[in-house]
Design a protein with these regions (language model features):
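Basic, often amphipathic N-terminal segments
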Residues: 13-88, 107-166, 179-186
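A structured binding-face within diverse protein domains that lines the active/interaction site
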Residues: 101, 105
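Short proline/glycine- and acidic-rich turn/helix-capping motifs at secondary-structure junctions
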Residues: 91-100, 168-179
Length: 186
């Protein structure tokens, strides 16, 4: 728990530089092999001229400008029972209605994780209530006009066999202080 050992957060794949607006997050991380597969897709998209994706591949449970300790405590209670967790890619989703949009893989998971994530989200006063849309962000803050081409390129670069994902770690990530606290591990 606490600060990363064995490398900087950037070496571990967290976004940098950190925006003052970057929220605290409770995140689920993939096994290294799957993370590398996603990064290969990011690299292929960048080679085609799309914006470079620097974020570490993850699935967000909830986020807040300043996460309340009771939300982190609840996540630490609920997530160990459901990690590792299996996910299945079921489509693409676009978040945002303004000039910059986010493209993500839409995911389905177990009822147990879905229930836990909804409880954690509901406990977060800055969250969306008991709603959770499991997804893995593939394109962050993309210009709206690039989204159709981005999705087409993403589909071309993604193996049709890469449908199953796993979450092997849950963590509380604080971008402002570059601190990651592991809440559950497989």
């Amino acid at each position: 728990a606490g600060r990363y050992a064995g490398g900087t957060p950037q070496q571990k794949g967290e976004r940098s530089p950190v925006s003052k607006a970057s929220p605290d997050n409770i995140l689920l991380y993939l096994p290294q092999k799957q993370e590398d597969q996603v990064r290969e897709i990011f690299a292929g998209l960048a080679e085609r001229g799309f914006p470079v994706q620097q974020q570490r591949p993850h699935i967000t449970v909830t986020f807040s400008p300043r996460m309340q300790p009771e939300v982190v405590d609840l996540a630490a209670q609920l997530l160990p029972a459901v990690i590792p967790a299996d996910f299945r890619r079921v489509g693409n989703v676009i978040f945002g209605t303004k000039r910059k949009q986010t493209v993500a893989w839409l995911l389905e998971t177990t009822n147990e994780l879905e229930i836990a994530a909804r409880k954690i989200s509901a406990a977060n006063s800055d969250g969306r209530g008991p709603r959770w849309t499991p997804h893995l962000t593939m394109g962050l803050r993309l210009p709206r006009e690039e989204v159709p081409g981005y999705i087409q390129a993403m589909d071309e670069l993604t193996s049709s066999h890469f449908k199953e994902l796993s979450a092997v770690e849950a963590a509380y990530w604080r971008p402002r202080t570059q601190e990651k606290t592991v809440l559950a591990e497989a």
